[in-house]
From Swiss-Prot:
NCBIfam families noted in UniProt: PRK04964.1
Protein's name in the database: UPF0253 protein VC_0872
Pfam families: UPF0253
UniProt cross-references to HAMAP family, sorted A to Z: UPF0253
Disulfide bridge partners, by residue number: none
Family: Belongs to the UPF0253 family.
InterPro entries tied to this protein: UPF0253
Length: 67
């Protein structure tokens, strides 16, 4: 997936990180898994959104990528 395929909010933050206005996280996969885990655990969110986040987090955890 390319940045231009992402939603406006993602593209805005991408530009801010690239310009130095927003902090870059070197351990990006761990950051993503933590964020997805928080979404998956949030019972105030719709179950469908939580399941998508849980699926994405599980796939990142099982992938070959490491921070």
């Amino acid at each position: 997936m390319k940045v231009y395929d992402c939603c406006e909010l993602v593209r805005e933050l991408y530009a801010q990180i690239g310009s130095g206005d927003q902090g870059y996280i070197p351990q990006a996969i761990s950051c993503a898994v933590r964020a997805l885990n928080e979404i998956a655990a949030d019972t105030a969110l719709p179950l469908a959104a939580r399941e998508k986040a849980a699926f994405a987090a599980a796939n990142l955890l099982i992938s070959d990528f490491e921070d």
